[in-house]
Amino acid sequence: MNASLVGLAVSCCAVGMIASQAFAAEPGPLDRAILPLQEPARPLSKVLDARNATVPPRFEVKAPDGAPNVVIVLIDDMGFGVPTAFGGPVSMPTLDALAQQGLRYNNFHTTALCSPTRAALKSGRNHQTVNMGFITELATGLPGSTGQIPNATAPLAETLRLNGYATAAFGKWHETAAWEASVAGPFDRWPTRQGFDKF
């Protein structure tokens, strides 16, 4: 009986030592495939007196090393071929400079309405898939045109924010239904709940 208790105690100690070594291992790179990023397991403290313990660094999500800046420019009521950046006659030096250093996307469906275009650009989905068939004031309540972007939609800004980017939106929003735009909320379709730190 005593021999089996000693054997059990030795086994438990060995398992405990192996587990503590596993927890003490340096965390590897973060897996960014699933958001939000999960905090790596913290090492167990081996110090009994909290006054002598070393506090591990706080977990913070940061953008990956060398991550590019992401700037999206959406201008209402301007044709695709108007700016010189896309071969048009209107000189826009700042836009030209941004286009020279970045990527130009020229295959994007627009509805010629601001709310659906913004919703499609932000989500990467067809505007009706995210319930923005018209501008929010003309929402019908029918599928694809409720004027309420589903909470299950992952906006680009939220994806970037969860990967450690600082995000901001400037200018017109026009994606919150009129009946949700009050000081009482709901706020889940406001810019700061769609992934933007600042608006």
What does each model-identified segment do?
Residues 1-5:
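N-terminal secretory signal peptides that target proteins for export/translocation
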Residues 7-20:
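Bacterial N-terminal signal peptides
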Residues 17-199:
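Formylglycine-dependent sulfatase
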